[in-house]
């Protein structure tokens, strides 16, 4: 089963489209590991997948603590995503992807700015060989995202002027990406990009809560998966916070107009 279908099955099974960003503030490796393990255990009934970032990879090590957390997630039937934003030459990109896949990650996030040939082609090739997924950044959630993702570009093929994010959405379709990251902080961009990507490339939206994005607006605009970090991991009651996000998203999905 492809990563995209594994995500659909996990969401269906958990009755949740919430992806936990397992991000914690710096601490000793021992404390980070223990807190992550507990968090994952208490929050897992409300999520469909877990996204890891450098917050844990750097202090815990990929094949040490992180691999144990990956096994824990897998035991709960939760796919895992490595948010490594791959962004180098092809040979390096392939090695990065291979390491994360060998450790047990089900998907990696990559940056389409580097292009296909000797860029992301080797990553998609490796993912195909190992039956894993690749999710592309299409419009990030932070304030300065417009400087890169929002700039006007003239495409080589048609000479037409487009926004960088529109070009990236076309690439996500052409390259067979398993998902596209579009910030929940820009619901109008989600709407626009959903009309290009349709359901072929599901939208993953980070930026909910701590960055000001709203989960209902992301649902209404066409996002499929909702990535939440600090608003859960640093909440007084992480399980309750996750449950609240899950319920809000499910309610908004039920009331979503059919044109989205
Ligand atoms: P938080 O909910 O705490 O803001 O965390 C969001 C997570 O998603 C972080 O791991 C961040 O690096 C990641 N992320 C993001 O916030 N915006 C993007 O456009 C892409 C991301 O991967």
Model features per residue range: what roles?
Residues 1-81, 155-167, 171, 177, ...:
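Conserved N-terminal beta1-alpha1 strand-loop-helix module at the mouth
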Residues 20, 50, 83, 108, ...:
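Conserved, mostly hydrophobic/aromatic
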Residues 21-27, 53-57, 85-89, 113, ...:
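Active-site beta-loop-alpha junctions enriched in small/polar residues
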Residues 24-26, 88-181, 200:
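Conserved anion-binding
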Residues 56-72, 89-95, 112-132, 184-197, ...:
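Active-site-adjacent beta->alpha loops and helix N-cap segments on the catalytic face
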Residues 73-85, 131-134, 196-206:
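Short beta-strand/loop segments at the ligand-binding rim of alpha/beta enzyme cores
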Residues 180, 184-232:
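A C-terminal functional module that forms or caps the active site or interfaces directly
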Residues 216-222, 230-260:
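C-terminal helical cap(s) of enzyme catalytic domains, especially alpha/beta-barrels
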């Amino acid at each position: 089963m492809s990563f995209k279908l594994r995500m659909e099955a996990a969401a269906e099974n958990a009755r949740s489209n919430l992806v936990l960003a397992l991000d914690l503030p710096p601490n000793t490796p021992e404390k980070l590991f223990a807190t992550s393990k507990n968090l994952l255990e208490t929050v897992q009934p409300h999520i469909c997948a877990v996204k890891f970032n450098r917050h844990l990879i750097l202090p815990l090590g990929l094949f040490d603590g992180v691999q144990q957390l990956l096994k824990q997630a897998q035991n709960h039937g939760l796919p895992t995503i490595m948010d490594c934003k791959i962004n180098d030459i092809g040979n390096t990109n392939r090695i990065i992807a291979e390491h994360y896949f060998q450790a047990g990650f089900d998907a990696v996030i990559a940056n389409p700015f580097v292009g296909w040939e000797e860029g992301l082609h080797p990553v998609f090739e490796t993912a195909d060989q190992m039956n894993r997924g690749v999710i592309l950044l299409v419009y990030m959630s932070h304030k300065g995202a417009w400087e890169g993702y929002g700039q006007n570009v003239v495409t080589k093929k048609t000479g037409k002027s487009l926004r960088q994010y529109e070009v990236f959405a076309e690439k996500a379709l052409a390259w067979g990406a398993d998902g596209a990251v579009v910030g929940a902080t820009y619901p109008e961009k989600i709407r626009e990009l959903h009309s290009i990507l349709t359901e072929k490339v599901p939208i993953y939206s980070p930026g909910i809560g701590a960055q000001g994005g709203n989960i209902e607006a992301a649902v209404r605009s066409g996002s499929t998966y909702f990535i939440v970090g600090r608003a859960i991991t640093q909440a007084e009651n992480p399980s309750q916070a996750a449950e609240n996000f899950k319920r809000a998203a499910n309610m908004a999905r039920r009331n979503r107009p059919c044109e989205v």
